[in-house]
């Protein structure tokens, strides 16, 4: 029957390993979004690069098929919450890697106040305490769809589902302290 398809890397490494400006920029993003390693950042940069490459190709292309692909690309990015509903193809070129990092499950769990820190958000996700739309997701890099954003909660099977859980009470207290 043949061999299974070869697994390919989902990221591209930088062309030169020691460019100080890139290293500084990566360090800031790694600290801000509590990424585990550079590979996580490179995956999202490659994703962005591919979106932008497709947009540039489609801007130059003419024809019925190009129009269909334009609509597909725009609808995907709108569903992911990377673009507003009234966006055009030129807006894809202005996306940054931070826009993609803001859509990660880890970031959204932290911003919704389900965790005190980004690191705790990552731990809650990996340990199976967070569910999206009734489904436990264990990948912090999961890109949350716009319609799923309000369906992120503690998992029903998690001890955190109990509002009286001591850690959850500390999270609520930290949330109250941040608002005051």
UniProtKB/Swiss-Prot annotation:
Belongs to the universal ribosomal protein uS4 family. One of the primary rRNA binding proteins, it binds directly to 16S rRNA where it nucleates assembly of the body of the 30S subunit. With S5 and S12 plays an important role in translational accuracy. Keywords: Ribonucleoprotein, Ribosomal protein, RNA-binding, rRNA-binding. InterPro entries: Ribosomal_uS4, Ribosomal_uS4_arc, Ribosomal_uS4_CS, Ribosomal_uS4_euk/arc, Ribosomal_uS4_N, S4_RNA-bd, S4_RNA-bd_sf. This is Small ribosomal subunit protein uS4. Part of the 30S ribosomal subunit. Contacts protein S5. The interaction surface between S4 and S5 is involved in control of translational fidelity. GO terms for molecular function: rRNA binding; structural constituent of ribosome. CDD domains: S4. It comes from Pyrococcus horikoshii (strain ATCC 700860 / DSM 12428 / JCM 9974 / NBRC 100139 / OT-3). The keyword RNA-binding applies. HAMAP family: Ribosomal_uS4_A. GO terms for cellular component: small ribosomal subunit. Pfam families: Ribosomal_S4 (PF00163), S4 (PF01479). It comes from the Archaea. Residues 103-174 form the S4 RNA-binding domain.
